[in-house]
Amino acid sequence: RDLRMSRGLGDVYKRQSKTYMIAIIDYNAGNLKSVEKALHFLGEDCVITRNFHEIETADKVILPGVGAFGDAMEQLKKYELDKVIHQVTAENKPFLGICLGLQLLFEGSDESQGVEGLHVLDGQILRIPDQSGLKIPHIGWNSLHLQNDGRLFAGLEENPYVYFVHSYYLKAADEQIVKATTQYSTTIHASVESGNTFACQFHPEKSGTVGLSILKNFAKLQGGNA
């Protein structure tokens, strides 16, 4: 099946704003198009944007990304996207952080010490400990241990395999929000859920049918305080 992109990044400020089901936040990070392509494959209406109106009026919002924590926070603040992220998460709009997008939701990262994260959720991003025989970054497929009935994982098998690419990992302050863990040198908090704010360290858009099921579960969520 043809999974080519039907929309490029373009200049979001030159087009007339409209309402989309899912807004994918554009902050000059990598991997945005892979997320859009996966959502289009699922038949979901989505747009890559940094337009405030499109983000605020979307039913759901995704913050993907591959890159460095400090650079990403600089870009979010440059476009004042940190403000709209705080707004939509406070409104309990379904929000999904992916990989770097997960890390940015927390307090700070060993990767960019002294740089404050978004503080949407409590926890720190730590470097994966060195261990003999394990390469860092952690790249490849790994199994998840599901716990605490995460809505993203509804209908999935007990220990699904998903795709990771990262050198830093989440240590959430509240383990009740942790919905999946994986093992790689240490216990990694691989997915969290707090209200309608969700985040995955792995890449659902690169995780085959399991990842598509996770994205579909996110797309089916109700927004606001419903």
Which residues make up each language-model segment?
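N-terminal beta1-alpha1 ligand-phosphate binding loop
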Residues: 22-44, 205-206
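Short acidic low-complexity segments
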Residues: 46-57
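Short, surface-exposed beta-strand/loop micro-motifs that present aromatic residues
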Residues: 187-193
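Acyltransferase
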Residues: 200-226
